[in-house]
Amino acid sequence: MIIDNPKIEDMRKQVEAQRYCHVRYKPSRKIYLLDMYSMSVLVQLHDAMEKEAAKQRLNQMVSTGFAGLTKAL
């Protein structure tokens, strides 16, 4: 699984920009909190994807390592 970090970073920047707009023009606490929530969801999603990719890389390394060991023996 390839993670497209720039895409997530763009989404994160977009959410931040929206949040600042809402705070500047519509000081509605509800909207601000909603944006903060969406921001945290994005961060959690990104972290989950990073963990999954790391797990897959580890599994791949382990499986290729075992294949290499059995060939050597």
Model-derived regions: residue spans:
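Charge-dense, intrinsically disordered terminal/linker segments
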Residues: 1-73
